[in-house]
C-alpha cells in the first residue's frame, strides 16, 4: 500500500469495510428468462419441460414478459405462479417467479414473421422486449438462460451439461420436426441465427453498405456464406460462434451486467441475438455453440 496515494488507500479501505455487505453472484443460481406473446397454448409444455429439469429447483428463478397478447397468456402465467409459489409443495417452488407486462403495439401475422421485409422491425422489437426483461429481472443470479416459449423437447440434463462447459455465452442447436414436404418426419435446423463466420462470409461483409441488414435463410437479398450450427459434425462437441439465436441460450450474468444487451439498431449489420453475439465478442467474451445438443421447436 505504500505506493498508493492517500485517496487510493481511502478507496481500498472503503471497499474492505463494505465487502461483507456486498452481494457476490451465487455461483450456481440460474435465472430463466422468457418473452411471450399469444403463447397460452404452449404454456403447459413450457412448464412441463422446466419441471423435468434436473437442476435444483430452489436455485432456479423464473421471469416472464408478456407482450401484445390477445389470448389469455397473462392469465395463464399468473395462474402458474400461484400454483408453484403458493399452492404447490415447497420443493417445487422457484427462488423467484416474476411476471412483467409491457406492450410494444406491434402486430404481424404469424405466417409473415419470417419474411425479409418484416425482419428488421420484428427483430428490433424482440431486442427491446429482451432488454426490458433482463434489465428488470436480473438480480444476484450467476447464470441467465433464455428459453423460447414454444419449445416442445429438450433433455432434463441440458442445463447442467451446458453450465459444465463454463462459457460466457453458449447456445444449443434448435431443430424442428417437419410435418410436410420433402423432409416430412425428419428433424431439420430451425434456428439459423447461430453461425460462424467463414472466409467467404468475411469477404461478403467487406462489400456491404453501412446500413445493410443481414438475415439468415431463404428469401433474403444477401447470401452470407456463413456456417450454421447444424453444419458441424458429430465429433464437433463445442464450436466458436459469431452469431447466436435465443431459443435456448445460456449466458453468464456478468456478460449482461457489463452492459451487453440486445441491439435494437444495426450493429455490424445485425440486430437482436445476433447483434448481441457480436457485441459480446467485441467486449472480449467467448461465444460458443453445441451442434449436437438439440432442443426441439414446435412444428409449423
Regions found by a protein language model. Name each.
Residues 1-52:
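N-proximal low-complexity "stem/linker" segments adjacent to membrane-targeting elements
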Residues 29-30, 53-64, 85-89, 95-97:
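Short loop->beta transition adjacent to catalytic acidic/histidine clusters or analogous donor-positioning motifs
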Residues 34-36, 66, 147, 291:
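Short beta-strand/turn micro-motifs composed of small residues
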Residues 48-59, 69, 79-84:
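Short, acidic, metal-binding catalytic loop of nucleotide-sugar glycosyltransferases
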Residues 72, 127, 131, 135, ...:
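Acidic donor-binding/catalytic loop of UDP-sugar-dependent glycosyltransferases
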Residues 72-141:
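Active-site-proximal specificity loops/subdomain of glycosyltransferases
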Residues 134, 152-253, 257-263:
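Conserved catalytic core of nucleotide-sugar-dependent glycosyltransferases
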Residues 238-241, 246-257, 264-267, 274-296:
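Catalytic donor-sugar/metal-binding loop of nucleotide-sugar-dependent glycosyltransferases
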Amino acid at each position: 500500500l505504500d505506493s498508493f496515494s492517500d485517496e487510493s488507500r481511502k478507496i481500498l479501505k472503503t471497499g474492505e469495510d463494505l465487502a461483507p455487505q456486498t452481494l457476490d453472484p451465487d455461483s450456481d443460481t440460474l435465472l430463466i428468462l422468457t418473452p411471450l406473446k399469444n403463447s397460452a397454448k404452449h404454456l403447459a409444455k413450457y412448464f412441463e419441460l422446466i419441471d423435468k429439469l434436473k437442476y435444483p429447483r430452489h436455485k432456479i428463478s423464473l421471469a416472464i414478459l408478456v407482450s401484445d397478447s390477445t389470448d389469455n397468456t397473462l392469465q395463464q402465467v399468473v395462474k402458474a405462479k400461484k400454483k408453484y409459489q403458493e399452492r404447490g409443495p415447497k420443493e417445487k417452488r422457484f427462488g423467484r417467479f416474476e411476471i412483467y407486462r409491457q406492450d410494444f403495439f406491434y402486430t404481424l401475422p404469424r405466417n409473415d414473421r419470417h419474411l425479409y421485409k418484416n425482419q428488421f422491425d420484428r427483430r428490433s422489437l424482440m431486442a427491446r422486449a429482451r432488454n426490458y426483461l433482463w434489465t428488470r429481472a436480473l438480480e444476484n443470479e450467476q447464470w441467465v438462460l433464455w428459453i423460447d416459449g414454444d419449445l416442445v423437447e429438450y433433455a432434463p440434463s441440458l442445463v447442467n451439461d451446458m453450465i459444465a462447459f463454463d462459457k460466457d455465452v453458449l447456445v444449443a442447436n434448435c431443430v424442428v420436426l417437419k410435418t410436410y414436404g420433402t423432409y416430412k418426419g425428419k428433424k431439420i435446423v430451425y434456428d439459423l441465427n447461430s453461425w460462424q463466420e467463414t472466409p467467404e462470409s468475411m469477404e461478403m461483409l467487406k462489400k456491404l453498405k453501412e446500413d445493410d441488414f443481414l438475415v439468415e435463410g431463404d428469401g433474403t437479398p444477401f447470401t452470407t456464406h456463413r456456417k450454421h450450427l447444424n453444419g458441424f459434425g458429430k465429433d464437433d462437441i463445442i464450436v466458436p460462434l459469431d452469431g447466436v439465436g435465443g431459443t435456448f441460450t445460456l449466458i453468464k450474468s456478468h456478460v449482461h451486467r457489463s452492459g451487453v444487451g440486445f441491439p435494437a439498431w444495426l450493429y455490424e449489420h445485425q440486430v437482436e441475438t445476433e447483434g448481441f453475439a457480436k457485441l459480446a465478442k467485441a467486449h472480449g467474451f467467448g461465444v460458443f455453440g453445441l451442434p449436437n445438443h438439440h432442443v426441439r421447436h414446435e412444428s409449423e
